[in-house]
Amino acid sequence: MPRSDGFSPRKNLRRSARDHSRSYAGQCNEDFDDMYAPSSRRRSSGGVDGNGYTRSGRKINHNRYYEEEYHEAISSEEDERRYRTRRSSNSMTYRQQVMQAIDESKRNQKVPPAKRKRIYLSDEEEEDFAEAAHVENTVPERATRRSTRRRSSMHEELGVSEQEESPVRRTRKAAKRLGSEQPEENLAADDPLPMEGGGEIVLPIAEIDGMAEQENEDLIEKIGREEEEEGAEEDEQSGEKDPEEEEDDSSNAESSEESTAPRQYSLRRRQPVVQFNASEARENRRARLEHHRVANQNRHHRNRNGSRRRRSDSDSDSDDMVLPRPDKRQSRPHMHNRGERERGRFMPINMTEKELQSAQHILMDRMRKTDAGQGASDIDPMSVDSSVGFDQVGGLGHHIQSLKEVVLFPMLYPEVFEKFRINPPKGVVFYGPPGTGKTLVARALANECRRGANKVAFFMRKGADCLSKWVGESERQLRLLFDQAYAMRPSIIFFDEIDGLAPVRSSKQDQIHASIVSTLLALMDGLDGRGEVVVIGATNRLDTLDPALRRPGRFDRELRFSLPDLNARRQILDIHTSKWEENKPIPETLDAIAERTSGYCGADLKFLCTEAVLIGLRSRYPHIYMCSERLKLDVATIKITSEHFGHAMRRITPASRRDLTIPSRPLDERTSILLGDTVSNLISLRIPQGYRCVENAMATASSELEQVVRALEPNPTVPAIRLLLCGSEQLADGGQTSYVLPAILAKLDHLPVFSLSVSSLLTDGRPEEAFSNAIQSAMRASATGPCIMLLPSIDEWIKVIPVSVQHMLITCLESMTGFTPILFLSTLDTSFEDAPEYVTEIFRHANCITLNPSRRTIRQKYFEHVIEKINTPPKVFDPTVYEMPLPDDDSPDSKPSRKLNDDETRELLKMYTALQRQMRLFFKERLTRLMRDRRFVEFVEPVDPDEAEDYYEIIETPICMQDIMEKLNNCEYNHADKFVADLILIQTNALEYNPSTTKDGKLIRQMANTLRDAIDDLIECELDESFVERIETVSRMLQDAGVTPTSDKLLTEIPKGFARKKAWSMTNSLAKEIEQWTSEREAENQKMLSKLGVAAPTLELVVVPVEDMKSEEGTSTSTDGVPASAGNKKKLLKKKKGQKKSKTGESEEHDEDSTVEDAGEDTIVENLEIKKNQETPNSEHDIEMKDASKDSTPSVQISIAEKELIVSKPATCELIQCCVEKSEGWSVSELERLSSVLSHTIERFRDEWNRENLPAQLTQIVREWQTADDSNNTIVNGTLNKSNGNLANGH
């Protein structure tokens, strides 16, 4: 039995060895009571050598708590009788034992106390007695409340005063003072001390104390004996039995036959204990019993959580401790709080639970043999979109065919591999820039493996899933993953971002990663065969992958995912727009978008389509951005045009520009005028055909069969080419680095590009290593097709890059043969004649392409395109173009706004049914209480027509309590308001039919009012308001999810979007709350209509143009002579009587820049009707607004004054000629700088109707323009700059 104090229960019931020795020395045999066991419990006397036994019969030899010496005590037949009596009492209950102990204590109190006699000892006897007393008092005595009271009572009975001190007490005090100086001796019990002349035995006070405490010890000893018996029963249940106890039991017969001669008992020396009073003992015992009961109930929990302290049967003060059993979870603490065992297994992501159960017997047998799935990773299988297949992947036909060879062919045609004794490829690595479709192909492969009879298990793991902070745990996860894949073979393991799991091993790397890489290498191609397990890895950086993985046997194939070319981009756009149906753009639009999206990856194109749809939605229905409620939209009217795609392209940064390593950028509409012909001629004349387009068999084949057959044909021969783009003697910067080079790369976007620029080589501070990696990658790519090696601004490159790298470049170029398909493209920011010697060693004069300044005709077209925007009129916002959609909350065609799975729907239906059932039970109980009340007996049954003939003629809806109970039985009440309304209807009918003039009428009316008070008391006090609100909430959730219960009806009167603001009560019913919510919603809708510019039904607005727009202080007068302000571009709005115009609506009708600065300056004229004969002369320029809605909404007529754009065409022509003459011999960069300033100035006047002064301002900017080559206020033509004080370039 567990103990709270840490000591043995029997230890707490005994006293020190000193007390017992005195008792043996001073008491008679019959005074021993049952303190020690009789001879039947002893094996032998064992007096000489110190071998003895405890009261329970346990051998105490060689125990460190027992002394070698012993004290003799004489046992008699009376002791045997008392012991047998005590043993027989054990069969009694606890209460009987306590009562027997109390009776024995009362009998012992009647025994007269021992008399004290004064004796005189000789000198030798006094010394022996003092020495014995000293030894007895070496153990400190601790008095408790119980012993103190008993000792004080004994002193009073004996008549001993507190001031008197006996020789024994003085000897005891002296022994205490010398106790620390003298060594502690073993306790020995001597024979009783006789008097000199043969007197009586001397009994010291301490011995009398021990005798006085004996009766309490009997009571407490019985309690301890009962606890021992409970502990013995516990040991018997556990099936354990001490062999020593069995030996003791077998020796009982022998000991009983022994003689009844005086026995000797071996006593032990014990440590002092903390004594306690009786109340504390009872409380501690109850606590121990309660703890023991709880421990028995939770025995299985205690055994699982650790070792358990067992009860000790020995008499020693130390408890027997059991060493804890080794727990596997303690060796793996991270596995302690795992979920279910099935959740810890590696399961494929492309198989459902039903498919796994169908082949469960096979999988379980395999996992039993491989010992897989025991405590594996705690990672849920990733959900894969099952709609993604190979048909959803565009531009990667070669990769798909390669995966079929690796995965499907060994499973479908194993006889081919068996015939030739070859192993199929079992490893593929995907590498390329982010967003090029590596993970998409993996998802498509996982779904393709689900189709057909032969299913393939697909395991998908990211690199970090297998990492762990525990030593060896990562390797264990990898091993279990491969074991599980082998058990469920054929299978595929896909490692996404495998470079984080198996990086390049080096001396600077952590040993843990090296161990993981070694384990992965051994699992992929070690001594154990992998079987039908294919490993696929994906990474963005192939150079960071460990080289040992990149060999046949592990990763057999390396598939490069490059940026899609023109054809691939067109296929990707077709895939993403295939389900748009009638909203799909025309094919010409998609072709233009595919050509403009050079450098976009697959993810960029998908996001481009998403952004285009959102922009089209915003341009068609801008109302949804200003309204929080759902509106009814006609999706078929949303047309996606090239303009929407153009806006979306401005929001996206393509993949080629994110890293800034490859300067790929197509020419825009403006720069194509200057350099479009140059780029086209350069690509068509100087670059071979093999670089311009893909000429492999798959690109030129007319059918899929031809593609498969001709896929093995070698690629056409492409020679090695070196091209250097440089400037001319007249113009060093012809745009070769900033414009021409990016445009060429955009045209050749189907080729892999490897940059040797300064930024790419000096990124990590080791240019030699970076240069070597780039050259190796280019050589590896050239083995499968042509590629480009890029070196921009070579004259600046040789100034920054070390000489060692320069020599490495020359060596690399010289090692290339003429058949190496590498296009080495470089630019020079000066002319070839001024090039450094290093450049002339690499490039010949035949490899140079000189860019000359733009011709006059080209520059004229260029500036005409820039200045063309000056003739664009300002945009006038017309709200009638945007049709206002109607709210769509209550439409039956609207889809559910809340999506619930099957489990959530089942739980929600179960909850709603339970709530309805609880509500009906509550109402039935309360209604039954009202029906039993004799005061309301008149309302229980229907009114008898014989007693009230005209009742059913006067009362339209008669009702009684029986009718209400019948409705409850038929489940017609789904809300508390309906039940309360029917109860109140009883009162209403009673008050309506029974007049207050008659005696019976007064009595019935009084009962009806009392019924109403009883109803209010029941509902308000006993019905929980949160319970009613919970019913409303669950019903609304089911309505949002589109779920209809079969048994209980939903609260269909609750509209969508309804939410309570106040708690439910009898005064605040559901109908009242819905009515208040509806009124607030209508007010919000009206406010939204005013924001959108749609007026009220009775509102009619007329716009009157201001007569003098240029006058600074003039005022305009209306037909009634009311003055109105004449500020810049203000419009006077007039309304009918009783209507007020909102500032919000006015600001929406006006253009953004024509908004008045102070709304208070406008004078609103009321009570004014403008007729046709009262129109002003400028009314022919007014435009009437269309109807705000095609439905039966009221028409709103708004006239907007249309003005003519004032621009001087001769001044515009002179501006263009000035720009052409000024830009003679300018570079492309300088022309772009000037055009940007001109465009910015034109944009400042985009909202102005009068632009007469704009050409003059632009001409002044052009004439004052200072180029980068100008200095000391001079320009190219040699004329002086007259505006010395102005800032150059319009800044």
From Swiss-Prot:
Record-level Gene Ontology MF annotations: ATP binding; ATP hydrolysis activity; chromatin binding; histone binding
Compositional bias segments (type: Acidic residues): 226-257, 1148-1164
Stretches the record annotates as Disordered: 1-345, 1110-1194
Gene3D superfamilies: 1.10.8.60, Bromodomain-like, P-loop containing nucleotide triphosphate hydrolases
Any one Gene Ontology cellular component term annotated for this protein: nucleus
GO biological process: nucleosome assembly; nucleosome disassembly; regulation of heterochromatin formation; transcription initiation-coupled chromatin remodeling
Binding of ATP, residues: 432-439
Biased amino acid composition, Basic and acidic residues: 64-82, 1168-1190
Bromo domain sequence ranges: 914-1022
Domain of life of the organism encoding this protein: Eukaryota
Function: Thought to form a complex that enhances transcription from repetitive DNA sequences by modulating chromatin structure.
Annotated protein name in UniProt: Tat-binding homolog 7
Protein source organism: Caenorhabditis elegans
Gene this chain is encoded by: lex-1
